[in-house]
Amino acid sequence: MKNPPAPTHDLIWYGPLFEGEIHTDESSFLAIKNQKSQSAFAPVKLLVDTGSNISGIDHSIVKRLSLPRYQNPARVDGVGGIHSVGLYRCILFLRIFGMKGLPLDVVAGDYRHSPYDGIIGRDVLQFCKFTFDGPGNKFVLEAINF
């Protein structure tokens, strides 16, 4: 099945945002996509962050969906040094993936004062082509061989 064409999105002052969904696991994702269940999922706005090697979502989403946590924390090198943060498993759905979901490990962060719910890092971008047109005030994110 071919992925849908990648739409062009307008840039906003804080960067490229992309809408998606966070699902708890593969079975709930498939049940929702096959219209066999009303399992909980979270619609999200995610900032494309090419400088991050791992994606992250807000603590409130992790809590609301009761995402499974790994026993060992992730070590993230960011502003202020290296931090130890919770690492969780989820399924990320972006429209550019067609009907597929991406099993993903994410870190939980504090995005409550941001206009987005988390970030898309290079762990997701490795499956995508990201085109950033600053002068045109546009960006395109498309799935490649997904």
Where are these regions (language model features)?
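Pepsin/retropepsin-fold aspartyl endopeptidases
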Residues: 1-146
